[in-house]
Amino acid sequence: MAKGQSLQDPFLNALRRERVPVSIYLVNGIKLQGQIESFDQFVILLKNTVSQMVYKHAISTVVPSRPVSHHSNNAGGGTGSNFHHGSNAQGSSAPAQDSDETE
């Protein structure tokens, strides 16, 4: 739970608090849209016309409609500026920070 949660929680909390519309892409390619109503260790509750419980293991990407400030006193360590938060990167496929893990 350590490092992964320290990035996820502040990011998802900021999206929830500020009611930022998000697009959530699932691993099977389906795109869901709405606002994050709530979340826990395993699921995100996404609200649009209905509420949907989306399991985190099925999520590929969460893309906010606008940038959000999600830093909570550097809880995630490191610089924090390399964290991808959907800043309208059209066509730019910037490598992940840990590029040796992606292929």
From Swiss-Prot:
Sm domain segment(s): 9-68
Keyword field: RNA-binding, Stress response
Membership in a protein family: Belongs to the Hfq family.
Record's protein name: RNA-binding protein Hfq
Positions of region (Disordered): 63-103
InterPro entries linked: Hfq, LSM_dom_sf, Sm
GO CC terms: cytosol
A GO term, aspect molecular function: RNA binding
The UniProt record lists the keyword RNA-binding: yes
GO BP terms in the entry: regulation of DNA-templated transcription; regulation of RNA stability; regulation of translation, ncRNA-mediated
Superkingdom: Bacteria
Function comment: RNA chaperone that binds small regulatory RNA (sRNAs) and mRNAs to facilitate mRNA translational regulation in response to envelope stress, environmental stress and changes in metabolite concentrations. Also binds with high specificity to tRNAs.
Compositional bias of kind Polar residues: 81-96
